[in-house]
Amino acid sequence: MQRDICRGLGAAALAALLPSAAAEAHGFAGDRFFPATILTDDPFVASEASLPTVTLNPTQSDGSRELDIGPDLSMLITPNWDFTIGSDWQHIRSPGMPTVTGWGGLNTGTQYQLFINAPHEAMALAGLNVNWANTGSQAVGAPDFTTLSPTIDFGKGFGDLPDSLPWLRPFALTGNLSFDFPTKTQSMGMLNPNVFNYGFAIEYSIPYLQGEVRDIGLGPPFNRMIPLVEFALSSPFNRGFSGTTTGTVQPGVIWAGPYFQVGAEMIIPTNSLSGHGIGGVVQLHFYLDDLFPNGIGRPISQW
């Protein structure tokens, strides 16, 4: 995702060392299909859209509860480089207080596919996400400062394990590492810390099991299901917030078709700072590059 001559030189060097990222279809590394996970980011660039994602968050320590409904769009600029944009409409209910609604801040991002290694079912990308200042409603807590978040996303399938471990080969692991850098150290009387974000997803692909390991006779809709558990944690590390890690664990399942997928997960807080009780999220997600390969799903440039 570099924006100058260095990007061209870096991409050329990677192309000489690694298998071509552009040669693979949406979310594939060899025989491995990586679905678009709900909580953590995908390790591949693509033209795709989540329309919508609906999230009922666990109850917070002050008794408030938030419902988020939001679209998210990703478009390929080149076969290895994309741009993302999204936001959430938020509905927050607090005990003894009026309900507040409004849009959260605008989020954009850009990602560059570092490599896709088909024989080892591995891929990774580097990106930069931005949460923009003054682009949402203050009533729902949209920030008045911009946050820059460089990120690394990766995925690894276990299909290259030996044949003596057949039932482990459908497993895959994806993950994210990122840092948040707010452009203001303080706003509205509150300090804004830097934050280390880390998350991963453990997946077990029924399509991979039946197509690449052993057909166990599952028919529709189970033959396209991918059970998974996602984990995401955020750890501030300065400005008085050290030791206040929050996060969620989200077990669920994704049904992945040729042109779209449907996913649902429970939301379980990791500690009292993250809330209490159980939440949930559902998502309808479209593969635009497969739906419209000669239209809006096509990269703007083939460079």
Q: Where are each of the predicted segments found?
A:
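Short coil/turn motifs at helix boundaries and re-entrant loops, enriched in small/polar
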Residues: 14-17, 269
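Short non-domain terminal segments
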Residues: 3-4, 15-16, 32, 229
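Transmembrane beta-barrel domains of Gram-negative outer membranes and organellar outer membranes
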Residues: 25-303
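Bacterial N-terminal signal peptides that target proteins for export
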Residues: 1-10
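Short N-terminal leader segment in a subset of presequences, especially plant chloroplast
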Residues: 9-11, 33-34
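C-terminal segment of classical bacterial N-terminal signal peptides
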Residues: 16-24
